[in-house]
Amino acid sequence: MCNCQDFCRSLIRVFLVVALAVGGPPVQGAEVTLAQAVLALEASLAANPVAKAAGANATMRYAEGLVASALAVFEQSRHLDKPYFHRSEGIDGRAGLYNPDNLYSTALVTDQGRYRIRGRRGSHVMLTLQTLDTYPNVGLGRNLSVIDLDAMGIKPGESFELLLGGARQADRWVPLPAGTRALLARQTFSDWEQQTPTTLSIERLDREAPRLDSSVPWRTAADYLQASERTWNEGYLPMIQRLPENRLLPPRASDTGTGGLGGQQSVMARYRLRSDQALLIKVRKSDARYQGIQLGDPWFVTPNYVDHQVSLTSAQAVIDADGYLRFVISLTDPGVANWLDPAGFAEGYVFMRWQGLARPLADDEAPTAELVDLADLSARLPATTRRVTQDERNDQLLRRQWVPIRRLP
């Protein structure tokens, strides 16, 4: 069971330090509301059975991630007249199973505002912009629209401008749907070593936003924590815990009604393994612009994906001669190239994604899963399966240091 009360109290002090840095403490009552939200989060995590399965360290990182996101929302909500893209940072602890193959950047906006986005397109495989009716990760908000910047003909290396909101413009203009509160930019990479990121900036073109009462950002941060606790700990986690263990359901379109990316198909499953077992996943290499698989811990959080090979794209993985990708999930290294390392978690989640498909996946393209004894794994794999030595495994991990998050200027 995680006892993170001292940690949570220290987070309250962090918020107070921020308040002093930006021009004085919060108004009376705002601090109490935030303190209550942080301590309520601590109590919720400590009482949740998931804390036992995840362990104290993972639970602490999860709490850190939620509060760090609240701090980002606090800061952004102070600057609605001068918005900016906030890049999600860190390599673990972020709620909602962040995809290691994506760079996520968020900006807070209003549906009545007019904005200009400037950027220079990188060479990564996909670039989308979603309009959401809630702050990202505050809840499973609705995905109001998806803007595919690649469909606008923006090529790698090209500088571009995009106008949002207000009256219709002649070129590269998109409306902001009623209820829009945030933009989520998503850059998807299939080759971490070779592909480059897109640079993005945003400015507000219309009148300045109304001056906020000084308590609003604080209450917004408190609302974030309270909504996150309801969304993940009380809502989403109990739902996905009902998924069958070690079995894959058919691919489905992502639910844009809960903030998912439109045009994506996905498979989510639970795994549970003993130390002498492996889960063998077999899937056909598709013609999707992006195809990837990743693991999540019991909190539905991506483990440290730099020091552990918790994810692979179809470009990173070895494709067998029959056109299939075979991934092995096991607590110990089985010596195959396509090992997915659960980072010590004996139970957790598997998530597979296909983006940019020319057509929906056919029934025979659905992935399969087989639970096997580690001693029998070799017999279940093709004779030509790529094996790796410890030095080669170390080299794989060394190459993962070229994560997109470290390649931004």
Feature map (PLM): residue ranges:
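N-terminal secretory signal peptides that target proteins for export/translocation
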Residues: 1-9
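Bacterial N-terminal signal peptides
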Residues: 13-23
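A compositional/structural signature for long, glycine/proline-rich flexible linkers
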Residues: 28-409
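Intrinsically disordered, low-complexity regions enriched in polar/acidic and amide residues
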Residues: 4, 25-27
